[in-house]
Regions:
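Short, mixed charged/polar active-site loops
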Residues: 1, 68-72, 108
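Catalytic nucleophile loop of clan PA
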Residues: 90-114
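C-terminal cap/linker of serine protease catalytic domains
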Residues: 114-172
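Chymotrypsin/trypsin-fold serine protease catalytic domain
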Residues: 24-27, 32-91, 95, 132
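Conserved catalytic-core segment of clan PA serine endopeptidases
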Residues: 1-36
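A short, polar/proline- and glycine-enriched secondary-structure boundary/capping micro-motif
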Residues: 69, 96-100, 121-125
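Short, solvent-exposed aromatic-acidic interface loops
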Residues: 7-13, 90-94, 115-119
Length: 172
């Protein structure tokens, strides 16, 4: 029922000119107020950092295709390094934030998120960021800003449970 917490990388400043530094940090992590049941949406695992020559796919809503999800099944990482990925994926305005997937171990994994792209004349090019270290930093930021966990009382009776508390109770 909404977003409980947001962590945005301090290296990203909205409204500034596009640069490698901006693309590298163009990610935020949202902590939801309530978990999404796995029966509704299965979570995706992050892929190991992207590499040049890697085949990827992009799922997005972009300008002119807002009503239907677009899936480019085959495009690739053309360059990777210094926390950045260049892709030959066909993205358009509005595709920012779209996940870039790769298939690893028989499962789709997120390798990047679209930050920007250029389709003006010439072949398509899109840019994303390397996620593993960035996501770890954002998770740490969420933990720091969450504050200490609040203790809650729980009634435990002899002979009941034990598995949830770690303690085992036996009737005398």
């Amino acid at each position: 029922s909404g977003v409980a917490q947001v962590a945005a990388h301090p290296g990203y400043v909205p409204g500034y000119a596009l640069s490698a530094e901006m693309i590298r940090h163009d990610t935020a992590l949202l902590k939801l107020a309530a978990p999404i049941p796995s029966a509704v949406a299965a979570p995706f695992v992050l892929a190991v950092e992207g590499r040049a020559g890697q085949e990827v796919s992009v799922v997005s809503y972009g300008r002119g295709r807002e009503a239907a999800l677009s899936w480019q099944r085959a495009c690739g990482v053309t360059a990777a390094g210094q926390g950045l990925l260049a892709l030959d994926c066909d993205v358009t305005f509005g595709s920012s934030g779209a996940p870039v997937f790769t298939g690893e171990h028989g499962r789709a994994r997120i390798v990047s998120v679209i930050s920007s792209g250029n389709t003006s004349g010439g072949p398509p090019i899109a840019y994303g960021m390397a996620l593993p270290d960035l996501v770890e930093d954002l998770k740490a930021q969420l933990r720091r800003e969450a504050g200490p966990a609040t203790a809650t009382a729980r009634r435990v009776k002899v002979g009941q449970g034990g598995g949830a508390s770690g303690a085992k109770f036996a009737k005398p």
